[in-house]
Design a protein with these regions (language model features):
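Flexible, acidic/glycine-enriched loop-and-adjacent beta/alpha segments
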Residues: 87-137, 193-194, 200
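N-terminal type II signal-anchor transmembrane helix
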Residues: 1-68, 106, 126
Length: 268
C-alpha cells in the first residue's frame, strides 16, 4: 500500500501580506540605494565642471593704492576694498585660535567637510536650537573664491567637492591664511589685518583677547555685528566668541573674566 505525499512548500508572501516593519525596511533600503546612485551620478557630472583651484597656492590679493608721507606715514588710500595681506606666520596665533574656536573648531581634524558638525546642525535644527553653522573654513574658502551664494543642492554639492579638492592641493595653514586675508569683515575691510586697523587702529599683533574675539565674531554676519554701527549686537557676538575661546582652551579663566570686563575703544 503506497502513501501519496504532497509537496508542501512555504507560501510566498505577497507585498500586501508582508508585515509593516518589512515594508518600511524595503522602502528605506530602496530610498537609500536610489539616493546613493543619484549622488554618485551627480558627482560624476559635476566634478569635471569644477574650476581650477591651482591658483590658490599663489594667491595675491588686489591691494588698494596707498599714499604715504616722506617719512612713511599713511595719509590716504584709493579703492573700494581696504586690505592688508599677511602670510600665515605673521598672523598671531591668538587671532587664529579665536577664529577657529567660533567658526571651525575641528578645522585641523576634518578633510574639508565636517560630518560631525553637519549632524550637530541637523539635530539643532530639528530641536529648534541655535548652534554654529556646519560650513567649514575650507567650504567658506571655496564659496568665497569660486561660487555664488545661491541655495541650491547642486551649489552645495559643488562646494563640498571643491572643499575636498582644495584640501588635497593645499595645506591647512595655507587654507586658513587664504580665509583670514580674503574674508569680508565690514566697513570695506577685507581680511583680519585690515579689520584690526579699521576698528581698533592697531596692528593685528597688538590685539587683546577681547579685541580678537570681537573680530572673530564678524565673519558670520559683518553687517549685523559691526562694532561701529551696531555696538550692542557686536558686544553680544563677542561674548559668544569669548565663551567658545574659553571652552576650547584658547584663554584661561583669568583671561576670560578680564576679556569680558575689558572696555574696547572702537574707532568711529
Amino acid at each position: 500500500m503506497s502513501e501519496n505525499t504532497e509537496d508542501v512548500s512555504s507560501p510566498v508572501l505577497t507585498w500586501a501580506d508582508r508585515p509593516l516593519w518589512m515594508k518600511c525596511l524595503w522602502i528605506l533600503a530602496g530610498g537609500a540605494a536610489f539616493g546613493l546612485l543619484s549622488l554618485l551620478l551627480s558627482i560624476a557630472v559635476l566634478y569635471p565642471q569644477l574650476p581650477d583651484t591651482s591658483g590658490l597656492a599663489h594667491y595675491q590679493p588686489k591691494q588698494p593704492l596707498r599714499v604715504y608721507t616722506a617719512d612713511g606715514v599713511e595719509i590716504g588710500g584709493f579703492g573700494n576694498e581696504k586690505r592688508q595681506y599677511l602670510p600665515f606666520d605673521q598672523i598671531p596665533k591668538l587671532m587664529r585660535d579665536s577664529l577657529l574656536a567660533v567658526e571651525d573648531a575641528r578645522f585641523y581634524e576634518h578633510p574639508g567637510i565636517d560630518m560631525i558638525g553637519v549632524l550637530r546642525a541637523i539635530v539643532a535644527n530639528l530641536t529648534h536650537r541655535r548652534t554654529q553653522g556646519a560650513s567649514t573654513i575650507t567650504q567658506q574658502v571655496a564659496r568665497t573664491f569660486f561660487l555664488t551664494r545661491e541655495k541650491t543642492i547642486s551649489r552645495k554639492l559643488k562646494e563640498a567637492l571643491l572643499s575636498l579638492k582644495i584640501e588635497h592641493e593645499l595645506s591647512k595653514d595655507q587654507i586658513l591664511a587664504l580665509y583670514m586675508n580674503q574674508i569680508y569683515l565690514g566697513a570695506r575691510a577685507y581680511g583680519f589685518a585690515e579689520a584690526a586697523q579699521t576698528y581698533f587702529g592697531k596692528p593685528l599683533s597688538a590685539l587683546s583677547p577681547a579685541e580678537c574675539a570681537m573680530l572673530a565674531g564678524l565673519p558670520q554676519n559683518p553687517a549685523n555685528a559691526n562694532p561701529i554701527r551696531s555696538p550692542e549686537r557686536a558686544r553680544n557676538r563677542q561674548l559668544v566668541v569669548l565663551m567658545r575661546m574659553h571652552g576650547q582652551g584658547v584663554i584661561d579663566d583669568a583671561q576670560y573674566e578680564s576679556a569680558k570686563a575689558e572696555k574696547l575703544s572702537v574707532r568711529a
